[in-house]
């Protein structure tokens, strides 16, 4: 299976349910669906609120990439970017704080989290669950001759 991708451009609003549904389409009923949905929603809300300042004239650009082993989402806003020192992955020290949990949740929900140098593009990756090779071949027409390894 070669990598497949889809690009989405959407106005910077908090009406994210339709976009989330499209982004999660390849996940299906995987055990991690709720976890990935939570992480993606948090990343999208952060991009709208903090990156684009809830300005509907600005857009979010999202790319979904599906490979045999990974599901990857790249979320880019039009903001100035998150500085490296603010890309923390721990909970706020003040338990009553109203903000500061988003990046912690994002890091918890995904297997790999990376930032662009500018800090306005976030890449989130989740390992795909291993499936018996025979089922993959029957459902997708793949086999060893297609370059897909048996040792996923």
Labelled PLM ranges:
Residues 31-56:
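Conserved ATP-binding N-box helix of the HATPase_c
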Residues 59-69:
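Short beta-strand/loop element within the Bergerat-fold HATPase_c
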Residues 1-38, 138-152:
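Bergerat-fold GHKL ATPase/HATPase_c domain
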Residues 72-99, 137, 144:
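Glycine-rich/acidic phosphate-handling loop/turn and adjacent ATP-lid/helix
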Residues 88-116, 150:
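ATP phosphate-binding glycine-rich loop and adjacent ATP-lid/helix-beta elements
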Residues 120-129:
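Short C-terminal beta-strand
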Residues 129-135:
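Short, charged/polar, Gly/Pro-enriched secondary-structure boundary elements
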Residues 69-73, 120:
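Short beta-strand element(s) in the Bergerat
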């Amino acid at each position: 299976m070669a990598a497949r991708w889809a690009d989405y451009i959407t106005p910077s609003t908090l009406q994210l349910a339709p976009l989330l549904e499209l982004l999660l389409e390849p996940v299906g009923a995987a055990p991690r669906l709720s976890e990935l949905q939570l992480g993606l929603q948090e990343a999208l809300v952060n991009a709208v609120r903090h990156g684009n300042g809830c300005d509907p004239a600005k857009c979010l650009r999202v790319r979904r990439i599906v490979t045999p082993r990974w599901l990857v989402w790249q979320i880019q806003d039009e903001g100035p970017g998150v500085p490296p020192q603010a890309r923390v992955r721990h909970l706020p020290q003040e338990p009553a704080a109203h903000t500061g949990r988003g990046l912690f949740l994002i890091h918890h929900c995904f297997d790999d989290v990376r930032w662009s140098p500018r800090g306005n593009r976030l890449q989130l990756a989740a390992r795909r669950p291993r499936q018996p090779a025979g089922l993959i071949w029957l459902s997708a027409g793949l086999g060893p001759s297609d370059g897909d390894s048996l040792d996923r």
